[in-house]
Amino acid sequence: MKISYNWLKQFINTDWDAKQTGELLTDLGLEIEGITPFSSVPGGLKGIVVGHVLSCEQHQNADRLKVTKVDLGANEIVQIVCGAPNVAAGQKVPVATIGTTLYDADGKPWQIKKGKIRGEVSQGMICAEDELGLGNAHDGIMVLDKDIAPGTLASEVLKVENDIVFEIGLTPNRADAMSHWGVARDLRAGLKQKDIALELITPSTTNFKIENRLLKMEVKVQDKKLAPRYCGVTISDISIKESPDWLKNRLKAIDLTPVNNVVDATNYVLHSLGQPLHAFDAKKISGNEINVKTLPSGTKFTTLDGVERELHQEDLMICDAEKPMCIAGVFGGIDSGVTDATSSIFLESAYFNPVSIRKTAKRHGLNTDASFRFERGIDPKTTEYALMHCAILICELTGGNMTSDIIDIYPKKIKDHQVFLNFDKANALIGQKIEKETIKNILSSLEIKVNNVTETGIGMTIPAYRNDVTREADVIEEILRVYGYNNIGVSSKLNASIASSIGVKDHQVQNKVASQLTSLGFHEMLNNSLTSPKYTQLSDTLKEQHNVTILNPLSNELSVMRQSMLFGALESLAYNTKRKAANVKLFEFGNTYKNFETTREEQKHLSLVVAGNKTENTWSSQIGSADFFYFKGVITAVLDRLGLSLFSEKEIESDLFSEGLSLCLKKQTLVSFGVVNQKITKHFGVDTEVLFADFHWGTILSLLNTNNFIVKPLSKFPKVKRDFALLIDESVGFGDLKNTAFQTEKSLLKEVHLFDVYTGKNLPEGKKSYALSFTLQDENKTLTDKQIDKIMNKLQQRFEKDFGATLR
């Protein structure tokens, strides 16, 4: 944001120079990122002096050139060849001396050099208006007052404004400082802290006078929530023309291009007071009627830039009796603005809902000075005052008259905030005691009204325009930035607390698993926790009432917190596959959020998503597609790495998956995974099979903290392997057999593996064949055949009893 030093001094008459002022503003939290000199004339007329033409003779070799002798003062007389028809002896003229830099019409610099023109030496240039950037005239040189002494700097004689422009890196929360008036308020508070008491200079509105009421507008506001306050007034008999130099220079200093006296006046008040205004050509307002309302989705509207836009049903519009004229608070329409033919205007000043403006501006990809301020929240109390100030200025610049009463629709006043500050809490947070009277003075200097002061704290009223100061902590921050961070002493003691190292460190576990997944060919992703509420419509598993809704969303697509990691993973997968990434393996650590009647729930998760092949194809072999069992192997490998085993399996009953499993331990779900339902993947434009896993990371971490891990030495006695080929029902899973086996033989059974599955011919209907491998080992001795047979018989009997299994 650009702030003019000269403009700033219109509001606060400080004798501090620009450098000191910039340093104080930075200390106050308005960081000065750059300071740039500005001149209303390119180059500031540096090197231009007043010369006295002593003689003027015809050039011997050119009919249109004259050879002059010019006195530049201090006994310096130079010869200059000039082609202007009006140059004559005795004139006082502006002279660009050798080495002076001038600027052409496009702003490109060029330098005056000593040279010869048609054989005559020329040691400078006598300048016309356009050559100095003072106007457009080029039919002759400028002739100055004859009483000006030769050698006088042209910048002292001609109308040149020199200024300093601050580039302020304004943080989004400081909507109150988005104007010269707002910056001046902070500067006053900072100066008062340094015992320099200055009052703000408020633009007067005493000249506001209604000449007649011949041009009235009927204003209707359909939705008071979208437009809490709407003001307007008509001005007639205006003359559209170029703005005076003082106004053009103010706007040019902050990189605004002057347009005409009416538009420039609205821009001037916007950057002066922070209140956006809009001038409508009154003759183009059908029915002398202003309707502030929304229009149906799909309505076409052409903005000032000539772009036809399709409106959304939530876009607030300024309409007349027949048509839309302006996107409220964002951008004007192509047919409603001020032109050279305009003779009367309706001047609008309003307070629009910040959330509504932000959504509309983002939907249409627009970012204007008005929307920038409206979406951050302006001062609702300034709306009428700024209108009066701008109306007076327009009347002065255009010769117009006010021809209606001020319309002010403000049914529900926006209230100031009430905050109580505890002194002890303030001092504890600041780290140093600040006297109560100092705190009171700082608050008063920030226009925060002190209601009452007690032994324990201070009650106050925060102005509505300070929408960033709503809590006790915010008030403490305000006190601290004005008091000065540099004034807080450094304690002689260093207080520190050492975190307990007992238990599992979450970040170490996360890094361990991330490294493992990376080694397996996965890439880590990071998705937005904000998502679209429409995703809940893709599944009955997720409920719309469980959405945690954002109060001020950037867009509808980012208006709720995610209930599941799945949809962000599918967005990333779709993004990659659309860019020809055939084999995708991604993982993400993140949180999910759910809203319940009495509480909100936030849980940690780890998600995996896989599509395509297990690995890239090589020249020597073709790699198979990543299937359910490959994916299960990755998941169990992660759990094994964490020392979690002996978990049970159960099928998932969720429309998120076409098939899937949950792995559980101690009646807690560790992970749910499976093949994502095609109805969901197609919504994201993904046609291939997608595997997704959702680790309940918070549950896993809690189990790791409660599990007692026992370290044992490797046994010196051999392992023994035995196999079973079992004929079982199709409904029986390997996990069921595995868990039953470990329950049956708890001491000597070490491992159970499934190494073959057969279904098809030669088997009874509804049956399948599993080939299982059992690993047995005694830590203290070598197992005998008798012991082994006894264990295997026990397992066989248990399988027969529990599952109706038979040996093949």
What spans do the regions from the language model cover?
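Phosphate-backbone binding interfaces of nucleic-acid-interacting proteins
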Residues: 1-211, 346, 369, 379-380, ...
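A carboxyl-terminal module marker
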Residues: 2, 444-448, 468, 472, ...
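Glycine/proline-enriched, intrinsically flexible loops and inter-domain linkers
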Residues: 5, 23, 27-28, 40, ...
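Conserved mixed alpha/beta core segments that line enzyme active sites in large multi-domain catalysts
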Residues: 49-80, 260, 266-335
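Class II aminoacyl-tRNA synthetase-like tRNA-binding/catalytic domains
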Residues: 74, 115, 291-331, 335-338, ...
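Mobile "lid/hinge" segments at catalytic clefts and subdomain interfaces of large enzymes
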Residues: 118-133, 137-143, 154-164, 291, ...
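Terminal amphipathic helices with adjacent charged low-complexity linkers/tails
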Residues: 187, 191-221, 398-426, 433
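Extended, well-folded interaction surfaces typified by the phenylalanyl-tRNA synthetase beta subunit core
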Residues: 419-582, 775-779, 787-808
